[in-house]
Amino acid sequence: MAEMGLKTYRFSVSWARIYPEGRGEVNPKGIEFYENIIDECLKYGIEPMVTIYHWDLPQALVDLYGGWESEEIIEDYVNYAKTLFKAYGSKVKYWITFNEQNIFTSLGWLTAQHPPGKFDDQKTFVRPYKPLRWRLTAPQF
């Protein structure tokens, strides 16, 4: 990438790699995995740009309380984001809190092409509220 002249590398962190159960104990190997990516980028003068959530909600949270269907998701997301900021905040300048929020909700609830695979046009327009709250909450840390 450096030989190609790239100045920035955008990648997404897998929530389940950091928190295998979606919450609870942090997976140190998951933290190390992304730290290695970040360190390699910086070593070659490439600025890491980290996407916190890219459509990969841990199945454990869906099973536990319905994932996006529950307000509990907000607290778990904030905890996940804080974990990333603490682990990588001194090395990462650019963060994307949520990847394509409008696509995630429409494919999940309007067309049922992505999880949760439900066709509910009313919820399609309500679901963006929660990721919007995430966006407004995460930068506070």
Which residues make up each language-model segment?
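Catalytic domains of carbohydrate-active enzymes, especially glycoside hydrolases
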Residues: 1-14, 47
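Short alpha-helix boundary/capping motifs
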Residues: 29-30, 69
